[in-house]
Swiss-Prot record:
Family listed: Belongs to the G-protein coupled receptor T2R family.
Primary role: Receptor that may play a role in the perception of bitterness and is gustducin-linked. May play a role in sensing the chemical composition of the gastrointestinal content. The activity of this receptor may stimulate alpha gustducin, mediate PLC-beta-2 activation and lead to the gating of TRPM5.
Protein name from the UniProt record: Taste receptor type 2 member 60
Record InterPro entries: TAS2R
The species this protein was found in: Pongo pygmaeus
Any Pfam family: TAS2R
The UniProt record lists the keyword Membrane: yes
Subcellular location: Membrane
Topological domains annotated Cytoplasmic: 29-40, 110-128, 205-234, 286-318
Length: 318
């Protein structure tokens, strides 16, 4: 899911590429519909009632940050497909890349803070620090949102600086994107600036996320042992809460893993830009992105209630 690598040009008018582009766009539409529902349902409640649960504030922010990038991807995919030999650092693509980097970074941080919230609120560790966090965490949600926007903006500016330097090098030396010297400039910037920057900015939220996931799995294991001893099993409310949270975190895990694999593959040059394998990989990633909001929708009680009301009103039942 690398915005920078969706801009280099080569002809891709063969039938397989066209089919994969169509599939990618359809998956984007599914992701747009799911994230739009989450954002609209919780956003309307926030506006009308002037209040929202802390967890739902994180969820609606995540839905909005996932909703917007899908339009960026659709716009960039359409542009690259129509203009496969377009200059990779022209103003249109640089503007789209800036939006992509900002929204992508925001998604990572919103997902991370939501996983922290699930872990602290649902896990039942008795350590004093953990109990203190459980009591204080809801008050910190606004700071989580502001820090996500601030960190995302900061890293996006750093990405923009790197891309701008490459653009200036192309202009200064009158190079073309397919020129050997031009490719070496881009490769140098990717290897020694963009790749390390991506590793740093993506490793921090991902490490926090997986720590929370491990803690939640540990807590679930303890509860399962107690539930089996009391013969309540999966009917135990605490076990059910753990399982629902785990389903949501698994959907996050798919996104985090796809981000890192995309980063490694692009850095290693395994999938050349606009190669057939590149579009296959993009389709797999956006399949994960399409499934993600669906899992979130069915793991959230409030969203399930809204969906049920929508289905009832559509069927004409009270």
């Amino acid at each position: 899911m690398n915005g920078d690598h969706m801009v280099l040009g080569s002809s891709m008018t063969d039938e397989k590429a066209i089919i994969l582009v169509i599939i990618l766009l359809l998956l984007c539409l599914v992701a747009i519909a799911g994230n739009c529902f989450i954002t609209a349902a919780l956003g309307m409640e926030w506006v009308l009632q002037r209040m929202l649960l802390p967890c739902d504030k994180l969820l609606v922010s995540l839905g909005a940050s996932r909703f917007c990038p899908q339009w960026v991807v659709m716009g960039k995919t359409t542009y690259v497909f129509l203009y496969p030999t377009a200059f990779p650092y022209n103003p249109v693509l640089r503007f789209l890349a800036f939006q992509w980097d900002l929204l992508n970074a925001a998604t990572l941080w919103f997902s991370t803070w939501l996983s922290v919230f699930y872990c602290v609120k649902i896990a039942t560790f008795t350590h004093p620090v953990f109990l203190w966090l459980k009591h204080k965490l809801s008050e910190w949600v606004p700071w989580m949102l502001f820090s996500s926007v601030g960190l995302s903006s900061f890293t996006t500016i750093l990405f923009f600086i790197g891309n701008h330097r490459v653009y200036q090098s192309y202009l200064r030396n009158h190079l073309q994107p397919w020129n050997v010297t031009g490719n070496s400039i881009w490769s140098y910037c990717e290897k020694f600036y963009l790749f390390p920057l991506k590793m740093i900015t993506w490793t921090m939220p991902t490490a926090v996320f997986f720590i929370c996931m491990i803690l939640l799995i540990t807590s679930l294991g303890r509860h399962m042992k107690k539930a089996l001893l009391t013969n309540s099993g999966f009917r135990d409310p605490s076990v059910q809460a753990h399982i629902k949270a785990m389903l949501a975190l698994l959907s996050f895990a798919m996104l985090f893993i796809s981000y890192f694999l995309s980063l490694v593959f692009s850095a290693a040059g395994i999938f050349p830009p606009l190669d057939f394998k590149f579009w296959v990989w993009e389709s797999v990633i956006y399949l994960c992105a399409a499934v993600h909001p669906i899992i979130l929708l069915f793991s959230n009680r409030r969203l399930r209630a809204v969906l049920k009301r929508c289905r009832s009103s559509r069927c004409g039942t009270p």
